Amino acid sequence: MDRYKAHDMPLGWLLPNDGYGAGYGQTDTLDGNIANLKSLADYARKNGVEIGLWTQSDLHPKPEISALLQRDIVKEVRDAGVRVLKTDVAWVGAGYSFGLNGITDVAQIMTYYGNNSRPFIISLDGWAGTQRYAGIWSGDQTGGVWEYIRFHIPTYIGSGLSGQPNICSDMDGIFGGKNPLVNVRDFQWKTFTPMELNMDGWGANEKYPHAFGEPYTSINRWYLKLKSELLPYAYSIAEESVSGLPMIRAMFLEYPNPYTLGKATQYQFLYGPYFLVAPVYQETRADKEGNDVRHGIYLPEGQWIDYFTGDLYEGGKIYNDVDAPLWKLPVFVKNGAIIPMANPSNNVSEINPNLRIYELYPHGSTSFTTYDDDGVTEEYRTGRGVRTLVESRVDGKNNVTVTVHPAVGDFAGFQKKKATEFRINVTQKPSGVSAKIGENSINLAEANSLEDFKSRENVYFYDRAPNLNRFATKGSDFEKKVIAGNPQLLVKLAAADITAAPTVLSVEGFRFEPAEKYRLSSGALTAPANAAVTEENAAAYTLKPTWDAVPNADFYEIEFGGMLYTTIKGTEFLFEDLEAETPYSFKVRAANRDGHSAWTAVSAKTKANPLEFAIPGIEGETSVENQGSSLAKLFDFKEKDVWHTKHDAKAVPFDLVMDLKTINWLEKFHYVPREDGGNGTLLKGAVYYSMDRENWTKAGTFQWDKNGDVKIFGFKDAPTARYIKLHVTESAGDYGSGREIYVFKVPGTESYLPGDINNDGKIDRNDLTSYINYTGLRKGDSDFEGYISNGDINKNGLIDAYDISVVATQLEDEADQPQEEADKKDEEEDKAVGDDEKKKAAEEAKKKVRVDGTLLLSADKKRYSRGDAVKVSVKGRNLRLVNALSFALP
């Protein structure tokens, strides 16, 4: 809390961890720990922060549990003042009832023992009904990579479509990190989501918003402050989501058409009725500072305004090459929007209850109903809340009338007397401004400056170029950067009873006509020449049309699938997520301020992808020598090179063992022999599979013709395995050879990499961190089942040294380099000996790589009394290649 305050960062709540060996108190009793928690909660509330718990323990006391991990949710709520609960792995449970009953119990306790407090629960997982008491967080994921942002966008959209509007995820992941560009982009788009959650202590770097220094600290602070300003809008659409549309809305919910009803808009969403958010989720044309562009932004019918620059976009098109410098999230406001706001704050205690702010983009006739209540109790369920209807109308003479109707309703702490501030987006100074409350006209004075405006009431000010960069770190280079938005008319009215009469603002001579952003050049345009999809630009799921540049063109447009892709700056454009082996047609034209050229038609067909479910990264080993390093060529997805056993040496019978590196549901494998079916073509043998390379199950036999045709072996009942063994008994010329072996998993199934405990598809330090934190967790512990149990590689029901060793020995900076040096040394030794000696050396090396030795445990006494210390001595005898030891009490 002190750290966030020192860096002027918003912070709403803090969740100490009650488990994973941490606990929230370090005393010898549960009551002592509750008192410890209360002292933290008291300090937090003095600083405007609420306290919750990140829990993986039971809710109620159990005598057999140590004080460190004891729980008493009643005392935590009643005595310590806990108001937030984040549940974890242990809360998923078996079936529906476990988790649902748990959050129901907590919700009722929070209300009953917490002075009618409103339950705030965030759960790892859930089912139908979870939304009644809990929101959802997406679980332990790895940040620092663009994939983290990419997959979360449709995840959030899908949550809303599933009836769960309250969705969040760890900022930049709980694991990983060390990529400030991804970090900033994650903070940006999640400004327009219900909640943001920092999970620190598990990643490659601290997960604070200021972890990377400048300019990232300044940008993250800007977006967190913006989120605080948008709280009245967010709260209003949150209340709507109780019985209406979710806060994060799939495009088709508001704009259903053939384009939005598919996957085409899965990387953008509506935040309430007025904001359209298109997160930066990949590098498109980024420079080293992270300045980039965003393709594929579909703006529906109507007019849309860049929230930061004020540029105006006509809807019904798909915009590309949209500027996205590092500081800028592509976010658009629908023309006509009415956005209730608050003063920027670091927590809700800093929000001015005597001020209401409305930002407007007047266009036609629009309305929005704001909602507010006490924010902390269950009284809203009985109707204790306040609604305010705001209407905006632009007439045929460009006069704007904004009517804020009397607030309706009441709640404890509601301040009826409020000042009202309007922010009207314009492009030139209006000719007249007036206001009245009920029948009473307000005498408005024009302020001389923004500072003058802030210090007075019943005043207006034309802000010609608002500097949006208001929260940069003092003295930083980013503070010097002026980021100008479109002009605004600012109006502030003195405090009045907002329930008594309507407040009406009238603006004469309203104009919002931004300068054209894209159409800048003039001159005749010719149809693009040489438009085509070349062979190298066609793939199974993508096509990239290219064309020659056209003189006088500002940008290009492509018509595809009944949609217009516009503002394409270059002479190529990539279409993704297409169907394999499917013909497609495009039309390309050039555009400038004078219009557009004639169309040029392009047709192309996507290629086939027969290897979609072929497993990559396979490594092989044979029981006989091979010609050089050719065995690697059997699994490199290149059919032009060949594997061959050692020339002039009989190979059969021999074994070929394939390490898939991942555990898969096996469907089949393809053996691609030499094109002529010549020497080494495999003809007869048997196939086995295994999880551990020690216990093998026979899958069947093969008998293949001696020709160059692809040979197919199918697995019955889709067994699960990591290893496949071919025992070859007959081959052409008694050798072994082949161009490729493709092993296919069952279509649509996932591969699991042993040791990848955080399930991000790779072994890295994030996995090691998790293993260390979960060391000693065993079957029967509440949070063992699930992805933690997947980390039990040797399947002994315990996260132990064996499991940790599997990961630690694969880390590049600690294991690979010494092994590379050892391999180099082995190669040098091989050069100095003959073939026979090499074989003997290889056999000896195999013996040496086996872990061996004995552990002897002895106690210092034969008998012990209560309270005695037990000393156990451990000695190793003839230990070989041991890099870790596990000890645990039964």
Spans of features found by a protein language model:
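Beta-strand-rich modules
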Residues: 575-594
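Surface-exposed beta-strand/loop patches in extracellular or lumenal glycoproteins
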Residues: 284-301, 409-431, 885-889
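Pro/Thr/Ser/Gly-rich low-complexity, intrinsically disordered linker/stalk tracts
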Residues: 520-551, 580, 598-610
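Accessory, solvent-exposed terminal regions and/or long lumenal/extracellular loops of proteins
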Residues: 335-440, 456-458, 462-521
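Catalytic-domain carbohydrate-binding cleft regions of carbohydrate-active enzymes
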Residues: 1-328, 334
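Aromatic, loop-rich ligand-recognition surfaces of beta-strand-rich domains
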Residues: 580, 636-698, 707-752
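Cellulosome-associated attachment modules in secreted, modular CAZymes
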Residues: 746-864, 871, 887
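Low-complexity, serine/threonine/proline/glycine-rich extracellular segments that form mucin-like
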Residues: 864-890
